[in-house]
Amino acid sequence: MMINKEQDLNQLETNQEQSVEQNQTDEKRKPKPNFKRAKKYCRFCAIGQLRIDFIDDLEAIKRFLSPYAKINPRRITGNCNMHQRHVANALKRARYLALVPFIKD
């Protein structure tokens, strides 16, 4: 009976020592800096452009394409739903007219 109490006390002491060591390591850790991304906005809504046509400007087309010539999603481009659909249709039209490749070689 006496041995069990001593063992329990020893275990409690070791647990307390471990928790103190953990607290010390937690204090050494530096907090991550708060990082806020700039809110993405629809370029076309900002300038009030309703019709999207990329036939004249090939550099504007490449802004909405990935390195593998795929159409970038809304979360990357920042377009609203309506303008993203217009961009996708304009890019498909540009592909059909052979202004943009279907896939990157």
UniProtKB/Swiss-Prot annotation:
Residues 1-34 are annotated as: Disordered. The keyword Transmembrane does not apply. PROSITE patterns: RIBOSOMAL_S18 (PS00057). GO terms for cellular component: cytosolic small ribosomal subunit. The keyword RNA-binding applies. GO terms for molecular function: small ribosomal subunit rRNA binding; structural constituent of ribosome. Residues 9-23 have a biased composition (Polar residues). InterPro entries: Ribosomal_bS18, Ribosomal_bS18_CS, Ribosomal_bS18_sf. Keywords: Ribonucleoprotein, Ribosomal protein, RNA-binding, rRNA-binding. GO terms for biological process: translation. Part of the 30S ribosomal subunit. Forms a tight heterodimer with protein bS6. Belongs to the bacterial ribosomal protein bS18 family. Binds as a heterodimer with protein bS6 to the central domain of the 16S rRNA, where it helps stabilize the platform of the 30S subunit. This is Small ribosomal subunit protein bS18.
